[in-house]
């Protein structure tokens, strides 16, 4: 959980699971971390915040696997590359010689993180993995080919991950062990190139510009601006603006503004101001 930054406050620590609360000016979040096997941890992420100070510094022989169940996650690699995970996406990355941060543009993200520290895997665990034909080195090799590897989770992977949310609490520690081994077995045999998602990288300039556009239209939500007017005002091409906004927030800018207006109207109705 040190990967999540200084906003983490421990709620409850157990021998198998520890729960933590995150809070900063952008919102709140909760995580539940399970020590599954030596060197392997599984974390449930429930985020309702724009960021959680999750800055991951380079680490040797360390692998991270993320599965997005709901919402969106912005993944940053280096200083200039941004891309976005959506529901059903699975990402694999090595922190070998590189760092990245994660944030949540819509302040809504639910997903699972699996971390594997190869230096902590015992000889006994290696024998178990070998017996089950789980080749972690193959997964790690793919993660090192590029900064970030994202695939659209197939039906089997989605089934495994969804079951991690339906198991009864008293069975969860043992059940997670089984499901993690299943997931690693599938990933070790996965044809990454065939399942690779055609995701888009955005530059820091494009991402920062769209953040300003988002804040502007929210601040002036009662006014109407055309795509062309916004693009000209913020000095970005209309095509790049539309593409980046949809990747960041999940819907076109007009749809986002319409939904935002409806949310304001509903809030005013509840408060008796309309």
What are these regions (language model features)?
Residues 40, 51, 59-80, 87-89, ...:
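Glycine- and acidic-residue-biased ligand/ion/polar-headgroup-sensing regions
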Residues 169, 273-274:
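Residue-level recognition of short, well-ordered coil/turn positions
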Residues 204-205, 257-266:
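Short, basic, alpha-helical segments at the C-terminal edge of helix-turn-helix-like DNA-binding modules
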Residues 76, 81-203, 227, 232-234, ...:
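Alpha-helical bundle regulatory/interaction domains
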Residues 156-167, 209-220, 264, 268:
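Solvent-exposed, amphipathic alpha-helical segments
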Residues 185-192, 212, 216-260, 273:
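Basic/polar phosphate-binding segments, predominantly the helix-turn-helix DNA-binding elements
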Residues 44-46, 64-66, 113:
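Beta-strand secondary-structure signal
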Residues 1-59:
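N-terminal low-complexity or simple alpha-helical regulatory segments
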């Amino acid at each position: 959980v040190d990967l999540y930054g200084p906003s983490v406050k421990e709620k409850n620590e157990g021998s198998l699971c520890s729960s933590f609360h995150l809070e900063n000016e952008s919102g709140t979040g909760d995580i539940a971390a399970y020590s599954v096997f030596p060197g392997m941890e599984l974390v449930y992420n429930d985020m309702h915040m724009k960021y959680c100070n999750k800055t991951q510094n380079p680490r040797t022989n360390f692998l991270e696997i993320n599965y997005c169940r709901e919402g969106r996650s912005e993944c940053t690699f280096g200083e200039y590359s941004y891309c976005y995970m959506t529901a059903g996406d699975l990402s694999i990355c090595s922190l070998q010689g590189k760092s990245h941060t994660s944030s949540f543009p819509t302040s809504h993200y639910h997903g699972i993180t699996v971390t594997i520290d190869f230096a902590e895997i015992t000889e006994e665990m290696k024998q178990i993995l070998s017996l089950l034909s789980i080749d972690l080195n193959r997964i790690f090799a793919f993660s090192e080919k590029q900064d970030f590897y994202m695939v659209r989770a197939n039906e089997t992977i989605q089934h495994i991950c969804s079951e991690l949310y339906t198991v009864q609490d008293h069975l969860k520690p043992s059940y997670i062990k089984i499901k993690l081994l299943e997931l690693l077995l599938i990933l070790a045999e996965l044809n990454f190139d065939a399942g690779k998602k055609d995701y888009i990288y955005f530059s820091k300039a494009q991402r920062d510009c769209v953040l300003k556009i988002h804040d502007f239209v929210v601040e002036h939500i009662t006014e109407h601006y055309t795509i062309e007017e916004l693009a000209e005002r913020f000095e970005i091409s209309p095509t790049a603006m539309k593409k980046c906004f949809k990747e960041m927030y999940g819907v076109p800018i007009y749809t986002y503004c319409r939904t935002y207006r409806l949310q304001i109207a509903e809030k005013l109705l509840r408060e008796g101001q309309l």
